[in-house]
Amino acid sequence: MTFAYKIDGNEVIFTLWAPYQKSVKLKVLEKGLYEMERDEKGYFTITLNNVKVRDRYKYVLDDASEIPDPASRYQPEGVHGPSQIIQESKEFNNETFLKKEDLIIYEIHVGTFTPEGTFEGVIRKLDYLKDLGITAIEIMPIAQFPGKRDWGYDGVYLYAVQNSYGGPEGFRKLVDEAHKKGLGVILDVVYNHVGPEGNYMVKLGPYFSQKYKTPWGLTFNFDDAESDEVRKFILENVEYWIKEYNVDGFRLDAVHAIIDTSPKHILEEIADVVHKYNRIVIAESDLNDPRVVNPKEKCGYNIDAQWVDDFHHSIHAYLTGERQGYYTDFGNLDDIVKSYKDVFVYDGKYSNFRRKTHGEPVGELDGCNFVVYIQNHDQVGNRGKGERIIKLVDRESYKIAAALYLLSPYIPMIFMGEEYGEENPFYFFSDFSDSKLIQGVREGRKKENGQDTDPQDESTFNASKLSWKIDEEIFSFYKILIKMRKELSIACDRRVNVVNGENWLIIKGREYFSLYVFSKSSIEVKYSGTLLLSSNNSFPQHIEEGKYEFDKGFALYKL
């Protein structure tokens, strides 16, 4: 690894890339101040033999300001405090048991998942998650962010594990314990921007683009002068999480905000690093562009899978009747049918919301190139009141929505608590210390999202914690859906037959067919089968070809 430090026997070699600085000193707390040597690329280095694990340090710049290491491995006192040397991992296993076709993902925000809001809290729930049937947990970003309360997308130290969650040792233990249970760990990482508080990289060098902007903060310089070192900073970060913590995969935040005009896009390079270690990488993208997941021979970035917001939007708009914002493009049953058949609803057609033609067809890509959900942190948390879908629809609709995505050919992702009918909201929350930034966040969330709760108030964070009031019927329904998904080999195979009427769908796979009845309907059934699961008791145990009157609900039949 190029950045931060390397422990070599009794010596520690420190490295800082700071081409904007003429001189830099290393200040090791309670040890001394040391002049670093600068090379022609702006790398400052020094080797010391009097420092050890747990020692803390800062860098002193030309203007005498003291800053943490931008590649810090741990910030025990937060984003403005000194960096700490940690014990490097002594063992690395380049084997992973996680296969894309087996993925059933469970998205977790560490701080609100359990009362304690730590990695230890997550560990105590691993048996529960294993029993549910999921195969991987996806951890929302844990790179050090300001304070103790944040979604994680305001992180500023890409290599440092959040102190309030349990730090490096806590995360290492979580990954180890998850692996013992046969669960993979996917880490959500943010390479499109850095947070607005605690970012000292602007003083050091051209880490950030002068050409491009994001709504959330400065974006990395991937394609301008001296971008080679910035790309190295990011690519080594990917490798660091794999080799130091043995994570099984990554979720890349909002890749549509990563702009790179280089001959080889940074996303393709990230995928190369991930695949070198037999890991998985998933992208969040709102471009509806198959290039994200297309293989290199088709000029793609070769990312393993990408999120599909269209799938969520089509189900949400149809079941809730909401038509505001991006939901204005959705609301018909035909949208659900199209997303089932073609992945993207907008795959080259005009979007009224965007006021332009949007997307491209996915072609022959299989279902495991796409991740679907009926809830996630964005779709819940960016609502003004943070409502989960269970507060917006009736119980039968909730079960129908669950079946639609858990039995789809795509990779399903459950948002924490959804599987048992969690009703607590999930708000946006933060813990900044800068008064101007705090005011800006409050005003921005109220204006853009209609959020009346104060993001900075700890009560907003506490209200977002899971209640763990488990609805056993819903939990059992989810558990059986997941079991059926595995037993019927549903994953990846997009060769399903979808037939719909005015208020119903029939979806037929190789070994099954499923009925989705959105309101009482007369339906001509052209298959026969034995009932495996239903949302209520109105469906027959055995069904033959013929015409039936069905109440609202869902049923799954074995052919």
Curated annotation (Swiss-Prot):
Effect ascribed to mutating residue 253 to E: Abolishes enzyme activity
Compartments reported by the entry: Cytoplasm
EC numbers on record: 3.2.1.141
GO cellular component, one term: cytoplasm
Gene3D superfamilies in alphabetical order: E-set domains of sugar-utilizing enzymes, Glycosidases, Golgi alpha-mannosidase II, Immunoglobulins
Enzyme class: hydrolase
InterPro entries xrefs: Glyco_hydro_13_cat_dom, Glyco_hydro_b, Glycoside_hydrolase_SF, Ig-like_fold, Ig_E-set, Maltooligo_trehalose_arc_C, Trehalose_TreZ, Trehalose_TreZ_E-set_sf
Residues that, per the record, bind substrate: 251-256, 309-313, 377-382
Active site feature: 253, 284
Pfam families per record: Alpha-amyl_C (PF09071), Alpha-amylase (PF00128)
Recorded catalytic activity of this chain's protein: hydrolysis of (1->4)-alpha-D-glucosidic linkage in 4-alpha-D-[(1->4)-alpha-D-glucanosyl]n trehalose to yield trehalose and (1->4)-alpha-D-glucan
Keywords, comma-separated and alphabetical: Carbohydrate metabolism, Cytoplasm, Glycosidase, Hydrolase
Sites marked Transition state stabilizer: 378
Pathway(s) this gene product operates in, as recorded in its UniProt entry: Glycan biosynthesis; trehalose biosynthesis
GO MF annotations in UniProt: 4-alpha-D-(1->4)-alpha-D-glucanotrehalose trehalohydrolase activity
An example Gene Ontology biological process: trehalose biosynthetic process
Family: Belongs to the glycosyl hydrolase 13 family.
Subunit description: Homodimer.
NCBIfam families reported for this sequence: trehalose_TreZ (TIGR02402)
Protein name: Malto-oligosyltrehalose trehalohydrolase
